[in-house]
UniProtKB/Swiss-Prot annotation:
Residues reported to bind substrate: R91, S204, K223, T452
GO BP annotation list: heme biosynthetic process; positive regulation of organelle assembly; protoporphyrinogen IX biosynthetic process
Native source species: Saccharomyces cerevisiae (strain ATCC 204508 / S288c) (Baker's yeast)
Protein's gene: HEM1
Name under which the protein is recorded: 5-aminolevulinate synthase, mitochondrial
Matching Pfam families: Aminotran_1_2
Reaction it catalyzes: succinyl-CoA + glycine + H(+) = 5-aminolevulinate + CO2 + CoA
Main location: mitochondrion
Pathway: Porphyrin-containing compound metabolism; protoporphyrin-IX biosynthesis; 5-aminolevulinate from glycine: step 1/1
Compartment list: Mitochondrion matrix
Length: 548
């Protein structure tokens, strides 16, 4: 896999110049929480932010010294909120009520005001699928609404056991553990690893999700942040430590705001070479990649997994003993995106799962998800596993939109995944574009601003699903083109004249091929191993506790 476009941007003086010209404020990529400033514009933004914080602190201190009643809490809160309004990062939530029987439609405050949703993470529309809803209805009728407490106090139940067995089977691991969300799963697992391995050194991709950043912070161990997808820098950092020092490489498969993809196999090679564990977040990949929807790690050995079905392949696609998915030590995922439900999980070895179950506070002290939620997620996983057509149609719809945008000069940050990030480059304009789409064209696409992405890289994030037909796509494409004309937003040629940014309009930039090959996209459900249809999946002992 080629070197990251983000690494190239970070080292490019032309890109820094572009940020200074096309954005009122350039800043380090703020999603990671550790980022260092890039270029003069970023330094200026950092200085401005520092002075603003200093002024707010001084005002708070003055209030504290003059008011007998004590600290001016409301003054501090007002100051922080005002800063967000001034830098255009203050967020307004739209009232969007997605309709179960009219996907991808939703209504706003008034039921008559309908819009087409183009930015949902319900990637496969399984939250509305009849089999999923039926499983939830039956379970709630039988077991009620809530779980009654934590698993430690209230015990767990058959839906929980079934779900964890399905997740372990999906990722071909010995066990899985369900959490209330993947944010909690990432935080709980990463923090526990650091708390129990005091000499652990964590190597984290700079674009990792906030949940991973928080987990690494809570781990309270030494950490290194490497440039996004820059494996040369990662290796340099790894080789600076003896092999005897415990290490962990934390990364994602698909990075949600730009659609970039990690080279999982090469990261596993580095982990083997330098004695590191691997922690892979597949949140934006499960359901969408691999013959059975286990994610990008499964996709790396696509044919071996397709042929073996739910069984573990005897060899990988290159004839080796282990698949890439087998080589990854810990895989976290979500039930709340492609699987249409809510919750998160980790899949790993039997011993690791028992360890997390026994020691992770984020698991021990959190009320268990409702039985109906567990049952719905299980139904979704089972359905999507044997329906590769969901994945192929989603990919085809994504390609259709990307191709049309390319022909119109609409700037899409290039990537090999299912994400369609339309570069705007200005927070205020991104919100205006989103507002025009929903109010004039009845299309809902949320603007993505700081701190989710860096200032100067604001965007519209579009996510086609199997339900977004070409007819709906044509309406979207025409609407976005209209918005670009109305707001005079920069197109590819405009970015190119300024030196390019994030792969848009960059001279000599070579875009990566889509993860799905043409032969993979031509597969049908009948091309899958029959053992994926209604398999008997046994409950796991580790879910309840291992008896000695």
């Amino acid at each position: 896999m080629q070197r990251s476009i983000f690494a190239r941007f970070g080292n490019s003086s032309a890109a820094v110049s572009t940020l200074n010209r096309l954005s009122t404020t350039a800043a380090p990529h703020a999603k990671n929480g550790y980022a260092t400033a890039t270029g003069a514009g970023a330094a200026a933004a950092t200085a401005t932010a520092s002075s603003t914080h200093a002024a707010a602190a001084a005002a708070a201190a003055a209030n504290h010294s003059t008011q007998e009643s004590g600290f001016d809490y409301e003054g501090l809160i007002d100051s922080e909120l005002q800063k967000k309004r001034l830098d255009k990062s203050y967020r307004y939530f739209n009232n969007i009520n997605r309709l179960a029987k009219e996907f991808p439609l939703a209504h706003r405050q008034r039921e008559a005001d309908k819009v087409t949703v183009w930015c949902s993470n319900d990637y496969l529309a399984l939250s509305k699928h009849p089999e999923v809803l039926d499983a939830m209805h039956k379970t709630i009728d039988k077991y009620g609404c809530g779980a009654g407490g934590t698993r430690n106090i209230a015990g767990h139940n058959i839906p929980t056991l079934n779900l964890e067995a399905e997740l372990a089977t999906l990722h071909k691991k010995e066990g899985a553990l369900v959490f209330s969300s993947c944010y909690v799963a990432n935080d709980a697992v990463l923090s526990l690893l650091g708390q129990k391995m005091k000499d652990l050194v964590i190597f984290s991709d700079e674009l990792n999700h906030a949940s991973m950043i928080v987990g690494i912070k809570h781990a309270n161990v030494k950490k290194h942040i490497f440039k996004h997808n820059d494996l040369n820098e990662l290796e340099q950092l790894l080789q600076s430590y003896p092999k005897s020092v415990p290490k962990l490489i934390a990364f994602e498969s698909v990075y949600s705001m730009a659609g970039s993809v990690a080279d999982i196999e090469k990261i596993c090679d580095l982990a083997d070479k330098y004695g590191a564990l691997t922690f892979l977040d597949e949140v934006h990949a499960v359901g969408l990649y691999g013959p059975h929807g286990a994610g990008v790690a499964e996709h790396c050995d696509f044919e071996s997994h397709r042929a073996s079905g739910i069984a573990t392949p005897k060899t990988n696609d290159k004839g080796g003993a282990k698949t890439v998915m087998d080589r990854v030590d810990m895989i976290t995922g979500t039930l709340g995106k492609s699987f249409g439900s809510v919750g998160g999980y980790v899949a790993a070895s039997r011993k690791l799962i028992d360890w997390f179950r026994s020691f992770a506070p984020g698991f021990i002290f959190t009320t268990t998800l409702p039985p109906s939620v567990m049952a719905g997620a299980t139904a979704a996983i089972r359905y999507q596993r044997c329906h590769i057509d969901l994945r192929t149609s989603q990919q085809k719809h994504t390609m259709y939109v990307k191709k049309a945008f390319h022909e119109l000069g609409i700037p899409v940050i290039p990537n090999p995944s299912h994400i369609v990030p339309v570069l705007i480059g200005n927070a205020d304009l991104a919100k205006q574009a989103s507002d025009i789409l929903i109010n004039k064209h009845q299309i809902y696409v949320q603007a993505i601003n700081f701190p989710t992405v860096a200032r100067g890289t604001e965007r519209l994030r579009i996510t086609p699903t199997p339900g977004h037909t070409n007819d709906l796509s044509d309406i979207l494409i025409n609407a976005v083109d209209d918005v670009f004309n109305e707001l005079q937003l920069p197109r590819v040629r405009d970015w190119e004249s300024q030196g390019g940014l994030l792969g848009v309009g960059e001279s000599g930039f070579v875009e990566e091929s889509n993860l799905w090959t043409s032969s993979q996209l031509s597969l049908t459900n009948d091309d899958l191993n029959p053992n994926v249809r209604d398999p008997i999946v046994k409950q796991l002992e580790v879910s309840s506790g291992i008896k000695q």
